[in-house]
Design a protein with these regions (language model features):
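Structural marker of alpha-solenoid helical repeat scaffolds
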Residues: 14-15, 49, 82-84, 116
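Structural signature of tandem alpha-helical TPR/SEL1-like repeats
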Residues: 1-10, 33-45, 67-79, 101-112
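Hydrophobic face of amphipathic alpha-helices that form TPR/SEL1-like repeat modules
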Residues: 27-29, 63, 96-97
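Canonical tetratricopeptide repeat
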Residues: 24, 59, 92, 126-129
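Bacterial c-di-GMP phosphodiesterase catalytic domain signature
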Residues: 26, 80
Length: 135
């Protein structure tokens, strides 16, 4: 992680407004550390530079979920999923719905993601970690 973080920060030192790099660093921090506030700041900057980018909205929705901000998270993830119904976005949206007790909706989102990409590892990891059985 440290080498990757150093590389991304080196890019940002040369181009502090590189939205894809801001997003990559923020998303990596979200998934590999508990530095969620820092990750959110990076991804928020990325989204300000590239509004409407579904990948960045997914990242920001995911870090908001990690911060317990479920309403904001769900809103961003739904918008990202509508624009780009990628299975990874589906995995994140499903997990946010599950955390809010909306289990049927979560299962529907995960099943849709698995229809798009059978055996998608991120969806399978989420449902396994949460102990979910899909029909």
């Amino acid at each position: 992680l440290q080498a990757m973080e150093d590389d991304l920060r080196s890019i940002l030192a040369r181009d502090p407004n590189h939205a894809a790099t801001l997003n990559a660093l923020g998303y990596s921090l979200t998934n590999r550390t508990q530095r969620y506030e820092e990750a959110a700041e990076l991804i928020e900057r990325a989204l300000a530079l590239s509004p409407g980018d579904p990948a960045i909205m997914d990242s920001l929705g995911w870090v908001y979920y990690k911060l317990g901000q479920y309403v904001q998270s769900e809103s961003l993830l739904r918008e990202a999923h509508d624009a780009f119904p990628d299975p990874e976005v589906a995995a994140h949206l499903g997990e946010v719905l599950w955390a809010q007790g909306r289990e049927i909706e979560a299962k529907d989102v995960w099943q849709d993601g698995l229809r798009r990409v059978n055996d998608h590892p991120i969806i399978l990891e989420a449902i396994d970690r949460l102990g979910v059985a899909l029909p």
